[in-house]
Amino acid sequence: MKLAGIDEAGRGPVLGPMVIAAVVVDEGNVPKLEELGVKDSKKLTPKRRERLFDEIVQLLDDYVILELWPEEIDSREGTLNEFEVENFVKALNSLKVKPDVVYIDAADVKEARFGEEIKAKLDFEADIIAEHKADDKFVPVSAASILAKVARDRAIEKLKDQYGEIGSGYPSDPRTRTFLEEYYRKHGEFPPIVRRTWKTLKKIEEKLAKEMKKRRGQTSLEEFFGK
């Protein structure tokens, strides 16, 4: 029996991509994935996940990784959950090896609804099991989670090569906020790698507007930057 798992990494960050990974593994290889320590994906360090990536891929029948960048996220129609459903379906339908069962890490508060919305749009027949914290419960989802996290980590490292220290990309990361504030001060706008629909950016803009008004006596950011 072929089992699929699908998960995302980077849903919440203010910059960088959201990455979706879908994997297909033969039921007989699940114990081998467990032996690698895949089930404890959240306890793994980034370096350990990176080392596991190739070992996991060798045990898979197929896998697909989608990188969804800020421009695509910001231009979506509908909610973030609907966007996730759409791209979970895209990833699963892109698999060349079709699974008999699909395990899904549900983003919706109603697990069954999330699974039903995906099942309705698949181009193949499969049993769907959608649950919260599926990456802790089902090995195929744990494997997908690791692939997604590694792919996002790699994308962030490439961005660091281009922009310098940007932190993890999460709004709660002081390094990320510092990068965004300093970039805005220097350029008068945020870099193209940010999700412009995130409230974090609005808060930073408001903070800097007050700062600039106080320091320069300007009435607006537009005046300050000569726009």
Swiss-Prot record:
A GO cellular-component term linked to this record: ribonuclease H2 complex
Top enzyme category: hydrolase
GO biological process, any: DNA replication, removal of RNA primer
EC number(s) recorded for this UniProt protein: 3.1.26.4
Key words, A-Z: Cytoplasm, Endonuclease, Hydrolase, Manganese, Metal-binding, Nuclease
Cellular compartment(s): Cytoplasm
All residue ranges annotated as the RNase H type-2 domain in the record: 1-210
CDD domains: RNase_HII_archaea_like (cd07180)
Stored PROSITE patterns: RNASE_H_2
Catalytic reactions on record: Endonucleolytic cleavage to 5'-phosphomonoester
Cofactor binding notes: Manganese or magnesium. Binds 1 divalent metal ion per monomer in the absence of substrate. May bind a second metal ion after substrate binding.
Residues engaged in binding a divalent metal cation: 7-8, 105
Cofactor(s) demanded: Mn(2+); Mg(2+)
Molecular function per GO: manganese ion binding; RNA binding; RNA-DNA hybrid ribonuclease activity
Predominant cellular place of this UniProt entry's protein: cytoplasm
The protein's role, per its UniProt record: Endonuclease that specifically degrades the RNA of RNA-DNA hybrids.
Membership in a protein family: Belongs to the RNase HII family.
Name used for this protein in its record: Ribonuclease HII
